[in-house]
């Protein structure tokens, strides 16, 4: 039975939604806590921003690639188990990153963090569909875990890093993930696997996927989404560093502007979604991408001209609007 049958089931469904949202927040906190600490990380390992950027690219790539097998693993082992693995591996990987002895270890453990965190979202969405009839609203609440993490994690990590060093700042991911893991394990009932005996090889079929991507409309949308995701991940990885090194802002102020980016990013998604219903998806995407062109261009121009905090904040606002492209 679903959540609208009895008060007990409704209570459990809302508990599940709250804990899934917290789990998503935990996986995001661990990844976003790294961004404001990049200057200190590069100084410790005596490497360039490009080297650390390569490690973070590996993290986001691993996050993307683990989305697909996560659904298969959920069908085989149950959603609860996979979500616990995602949150638990997030906590462990954050510890490994914090104690990394070299840039190679840092890179390897950030990839591990991305792979583990990526197991959560698809499986949690499937789990929530079993709890709610109005699944759209539930997914909307669940997705809110991302902006929540973006609002809180960067400034907190920056403050911790400024006082105790970047390694302690990285542990913010563990500090958040451990209690979420315990709460989820205690309050969520075991979920029965849907296909416990079917191997992953039987589930993976590349033929239909290839045929789907060969359609021009699908290929165009996929390419656009890929470019947008690339831009989002680049922003999530390096906006605080650019604000600190390019604009001369403090690490704390850079992290606060990074949080502002996430507030705008999350707050404008419902607006762009509604706008796409009124004027069309393509037109709305063009508007958001135009905001991005102006926003990113302004960030560079303001940095070169030394125009100060207010124009910088305005450019960050435009970048936040641009990254709401996913809603249409």
What is each stretch, according to the model?
Residues 185-207:
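Flexible cytoplasmic inter-helical loops of multi-pass small-molecule transporters
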């Amino acid at each position: 039975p679903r959540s609208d049958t009895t008060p007990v089931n409704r209570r459990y469904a809302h508990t599940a939604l709250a804990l899934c949202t917290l789990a998503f927040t935990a996986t995001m906190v661990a990844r976003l806590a790294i961004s404001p600490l990049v200057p200190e990380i590069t100084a410790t390992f005596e490497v360039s921003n490009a080297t650390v950027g390569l490690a973070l690219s590996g993290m986001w790539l691993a996050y993307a690639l683990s989305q697909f097998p996560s659904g298969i693993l959920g069908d085989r082992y149950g959603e609860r188990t996979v979500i616990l693995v995602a949150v638990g591996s997030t906590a462990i990987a954050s510890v490994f990153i914090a104690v990394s002895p070299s840039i190679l270890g840092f890179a390897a453990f950030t990839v591990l963090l991305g792979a583990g965190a990526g197991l959560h979202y698809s499986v949690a969405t499937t789990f929530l569909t079993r709890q709610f009839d109005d699944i759209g609203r539930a997914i909307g609440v669940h997705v809110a875990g991302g902006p929540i993490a973006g609002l809180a994690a960067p400034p907190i990590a920056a403050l911790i890093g400024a006082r105790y060093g970047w390694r302690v700042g990285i542990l913010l991911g563990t500090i958040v993930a451990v209690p979420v893991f315990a709460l989820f394990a205690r309050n969520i009932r075991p979920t029965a696997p849907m296909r416990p005996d079917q191997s992953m090889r039987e589930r993976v079929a590349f033929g239909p996927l290839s045929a789907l991507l060969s359609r021009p409309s699908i290929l165009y949308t996929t390419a656009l989404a890929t470019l947008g995701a690339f831009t989002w991940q680049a922003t999530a990885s390096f906006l605080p560093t650019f604000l600190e090194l390019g604009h001369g802002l403090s690490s704390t102020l850079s992290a606060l502007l990074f949080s502002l980016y996430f507030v705008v990013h999350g707050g404008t998604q419902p607006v762009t979604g509604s706008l796409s219903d009124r004027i069309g998806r393509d037109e709305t995407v063009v508007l958001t991408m135009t905001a991005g062109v102006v926003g990113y261009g302004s960030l560079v121009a303001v940095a070169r001209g030394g125009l100060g905090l207010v124009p910088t904040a305005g450019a960050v606002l435009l970048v936040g609007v641009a990254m709401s492209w996913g809603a249409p």
